């Protein structure tokens, strides 16, 4: 592309039964809108009120379907993104004018999906059509609410909570949101799941203009990286598509917003005002400065407004006479956006690994050409590889003979040999300087003229060796450790460089220690693997691994025991979850609960040992400091007395010698205790992870047991044998998911089954159903944990 182009601006009119035909007229080419207002007679005879406006656009979408909107607005920008061009699609307009519907659409109906899900679908369809390229797709979802940044995908299980607030960072590659999670997606369904997850976390509120009004700006970004599968070229292309759903502007005097809605509207209007200022500055060719940093919105979109990307604006307006003032304001913004010019360019980068391989091939080819050139010049046995130690020693010998005069000249072979000759000249010169200095030191005592302390010491005691030869030199300073309360629980698990297998090995060497049995990974499906088995005093790693294999071979904990068959019948009314949880821990979950308690007791024992070790370390540190003070006192006392042997060496007494030995032993104890503390901390982190996983398993098993025991539909109960118990696996998971479903849920299942839209809608509906099921499960778990705390 490479040429400058204008930003494309489209207008979409919200359908209404009360369309102002007399005031709003469309051009014949469907690329202009004319607005006509009647003069207000209340202003008198002299009335200079403007009554006519005309706006030139790239297209007017009136009564247009979602398919037509996407084909007109976004399809070209998305297809060019796979060729390496960045793209930005933005929806702007009044509150309730249809921005979110245009961008996201209705997630309940496949036909009514918006630009965003259609763009995801097009990306993965085009990837399938390009088998010669390996294309990686990542997505992120950013929300800007009241000038604060939020990650809409931070609620996913594998995304940890952010410790520091999110910030906008600029680097040579563009704008980077520090703290924003970016998720790899290899399938269309995974991308839809992330979209629905973010939509669930968006902030919406009821408004006079819209019952479900978006109260924040949202930016969904699709990152793409394409490598060639056939070519060995180190060059590859990257691109990103920013899909921006802006919050709606409003006139506070007309909407009458109050309280929190008023505060939100103030922030929204302020950020949109700064956005318009940035657009005006970009459209003015004489402006050198563009105020991007005035708001989080403009700063986050700095590399997406103009620049080297394809930009498309969709302005959503009302067609009613009552909203004509806001419609004019939105159309002015669209006309100003059309003044902004962009210069799209392909984003090319270079793969360092492939570049190294290509350079190695080129180097080998150049060596072959050089060998041919040497053979044609009758030069044989010329080596251009890096020199080894033997060749360097030979050059060093030639340099020495040249300096001594026994060698007249040094033959020049190649550039590498010339560089090494100069290097050996430097080495020989340095060695000669050291030899001269050593000879002077043997004959004279060298003292720095600026070292007044050394001069005074020599004058005082008459020593030739100003440094002296003392027994036991002081080493580096150590540090102390604070003792944390035993009951304190860390808010976040610290990172450790040790793997679980390393932690197990280190703890197995401790005498009398109880170590967690660990395989390659902790298997949540087999809860028996999470049990912490104490090891014998002289046990080794092989015995522990044998125990682990025996433990892992145990059948699942839930068995068809006679006790379950003889249980009392369940009451007709389901008990509360708190009572049912206690019953579950005594019956079905007794084994899981026992393992959980054992793991927790071993974790507490490790924490107690760590606290005791910390106290011992602090005591040893205090004793080391006291011993150092005593040793320094003895040294100063000895230096004052000035006791020396005939050779000029200082003499230390027995008391000072014992202090030196004691200090050495204390430091050894300190190192051993500190190493033990590090091992204990690693074990504590590993045990804490096992306890958390065991707790999660216990709650998950309880939820399944509760639904199977008290929430089974009547037709499933009739199908079961009389008096038999309900075990996991007897009830299909689809029936468990449907427990307590209402008419809307049944309609959703029917909608997914029938799929009138065709096979392309399968991934869309699957992602929607999975996201809804996950959020329902999370709500159930939160309610259960709250009732358990009470």
Swiss-Prot record:
Location of this chain's protein in the cell: Cytoplasm, Cytoskeleton; Cell projection, Cilium, Flagellum; Cytoplasm, Cytoskeleton, Flagellum axoneme
PROSITE patterns per the UniProt record, alphabetical: KINESIN_MOTOR_1 (PS00411), KINESIN_MOTOR_2 (PS50067)
Changes seen on gene knockout: Mice exhibit impaired sperm motility and male subfertility and flagella show an asymmetric waveform pattern, which leads to a circular motion of spermatozoa.
Residue numbers binding ATP: 12-14, 93-100
Organism of derivation: Mus musculus (Mouse)
Gene3D superfamilies: Kinesin motor domain
Main location: cytoplasm
Alphabetical keyword list: ATP-binding, Cell projection, Cilium, Coiled coil, Cytoplasm, Cytoskeleton, Flagellum, Microtubule, Motor protein, Nucleotide-binding, Phosphoprotein
GO biological process: extracellular matrix disassembly; microtubule-based movement; organelle disassembly; regulation of flagellated sperm motility; regulation of podosome assembly
Function description: Essential for normal male fertility and for progressive motility of spermatozoa.
PANTHER family: CENTROMERE PROTEIN E, KINESIN FAMILY MEMBER 5A
Coiled coil: 342-442, 600-695
One of the record's GO cellular component terms: vesicle
A Pfam family recorded for this sequence: KIF9
Region (Disordered): 482-521, 547-577
Origin: domain of life: Eukaryota
Expressed in which tissues: Highly expressed in the testis (at protein level). Weakly expressed in the brain, thymus, lung and heart.
InterPro entries recorded: KIF6/9_C, Kinesin-like_fam, Kinesin_motor_CS, Kinesin_motor_dom, Kinesin_motor_dom_sf, P-loop_NTPase
Phosphothreonine: residues bearing it: 530
Residue ranges of every copy of the Kinesin motor domain listed in the record: 6-340
Oligomeric form and interacting partners: Interacts with HYDIN.
Name assigned to this protein: Kinesin-like protein KIF9
């Amino acid at each position: 592309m490479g040429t400058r182009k204008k930003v494309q601006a489209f207008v979409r009119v919200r359908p209404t039964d009360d369309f102002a035909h007399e005031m709003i007229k469309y051009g014949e080419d469907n690329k202009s809108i004319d607005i006509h207002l009647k003069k207000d007679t209340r202003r008198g005879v002299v009335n200079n009120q403007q009554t006519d406006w005309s706006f030139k656009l790239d297209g007017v979408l009136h009564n247009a379907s979602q398919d037509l909107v996407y084909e007109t607005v976004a399809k070209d920008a998305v297809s060019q993104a796979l060729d390496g061009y960045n793209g930005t699609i933005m929806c702007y307009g009044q509150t309730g004018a249809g921005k979110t519907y245009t961008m996201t659409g209705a997630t309940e109906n496949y036909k009514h999906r918006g630009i965003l899900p259609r763009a995801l679908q097009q990306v993965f369809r085009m990837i399938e059509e390009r088998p010669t390229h390996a294309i990686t797709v990542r997505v992120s979802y950013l929300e800007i609410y009241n000038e604060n940044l939020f990650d809409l995908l931070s609620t996913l299980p594998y995304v940890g909570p952010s410790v520091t607030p999110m910030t906008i960072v600029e680097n040579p590659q563009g704008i980077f949101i520090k703290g924003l999670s970016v998720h790899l997606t290899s399938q269309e369904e995974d991308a839809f799941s992330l979209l629905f997850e973010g939509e669930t976390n968006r902030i919406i509120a009821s408004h006079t203009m819209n019952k479900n009004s978006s109260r924040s700006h949202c930016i969904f970004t699709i990152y793409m990286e394409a490598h060639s599968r056939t070519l060995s070229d180190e060059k590859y292309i990257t691109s990103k598509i920013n899909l921006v759903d802006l919050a709606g502007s409003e006139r506070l005097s007309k909407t009458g917003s109050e309280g929190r809605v008023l505060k939100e509207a103030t922030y929204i209007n302020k950020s949109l005002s700064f956005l318009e200022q940035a657009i005006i500055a970009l459209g003015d060719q004489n402006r050198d400065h563009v105020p991007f940093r005035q708001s989080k919105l403009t700063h986050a979109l700095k590399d997406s407004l103009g620049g080297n990307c394809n930009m498309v604006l969709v302005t959503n307006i009302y067609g009613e006479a009552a909203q004509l003032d806001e419609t004019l304001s939105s159309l002015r913004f669209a006309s100003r956006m059309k003044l902004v010019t962009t210069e799209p360019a392909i984003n090319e980068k270079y793969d360092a690994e492939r570049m190294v391989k290509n350079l190695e091939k080129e180097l080998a080819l150049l060596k072959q050409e050089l060998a041919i050139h040497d053979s044609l010049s009758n030069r044989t046995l010329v080596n251009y590889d890096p020199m080894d130690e033997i060749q360097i020693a030979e050059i060093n010998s030639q340099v020495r003979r040249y300096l001594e005069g026994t060698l007249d000249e040094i033959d020049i072979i190649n550039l590498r040999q010339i560089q090494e000759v100069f290097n050996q000249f430097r080495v020989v010169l340095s060695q000669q300087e050291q030899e001269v200095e050593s000879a002077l030191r043997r004959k004279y005592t060298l003292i720095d003229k600026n070292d007044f302390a050394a001069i005074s010491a020599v004058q005082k005691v008459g020593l030739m060796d100003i440094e002296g030869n003392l027994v036991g030199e002081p080493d580096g300073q150590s540090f102390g450790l604070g003792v944390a309360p035993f009951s304190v629980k860390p808010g976040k698990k610290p990172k450790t460089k040790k793997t679980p297998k390393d932690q197990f090995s280190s703890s197995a060497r401790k005498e009398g220690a109880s170590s967690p049995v660990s395989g390659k990974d902790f298997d949540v499906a087999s809860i028996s693997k999470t049990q912490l088995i104490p090891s014998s005093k002289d046990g080794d790693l092989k015995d522990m691994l044998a125990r682990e294999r025996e433990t892992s071979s145990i059948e699942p904990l839930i068995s068809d025991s006679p006790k379950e068959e003889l249980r009392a019948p369940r009451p007709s009314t389901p008990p509360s979850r708190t009572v049912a949880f206690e019953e579950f821990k005594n019956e079905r979950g007794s084994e899981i609960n026992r393992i959980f308690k054992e793991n927790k007791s071993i974790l507490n024992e490790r924490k107690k040992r760590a606290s005791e070790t910390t106290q011992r370390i602090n005591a040893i540190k205090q004793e080391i400091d006291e011993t150092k003070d005593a040793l320094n006192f003895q040294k100063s006392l000895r230096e004052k007395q000035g006791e020396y042997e005939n050779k000029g060496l200082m003499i230390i007494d027995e008391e000072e010698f014992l202090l030196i030995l004691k200090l050495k032993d204390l430091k050894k104890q300190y190192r051993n205790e500190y190493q033990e503390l590090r091992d204990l901390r690693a074990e504590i982190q590993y045990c804490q992870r096992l306890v958390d996983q065991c707790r999660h398993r216990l709650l998950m098993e309880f939820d399944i047991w509760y639904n199977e025991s008290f929430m089974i539909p009547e037709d499933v109960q009739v199908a079961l044998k009389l008096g038999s118990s309900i075990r996991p696996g007897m009830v299909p998971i689809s029936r468990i998911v449907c427990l307590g479903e209402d008419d809307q849920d049944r309609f959703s299942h029917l909608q997914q089954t029938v799929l009138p839209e065709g096979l392309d809608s399968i991934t869309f509906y699957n992602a929607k159903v999975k996201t809804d099921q996950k959020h329902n499960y999370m709500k159930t778990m939160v309610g259960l944990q709250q009732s358990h705390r009470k």
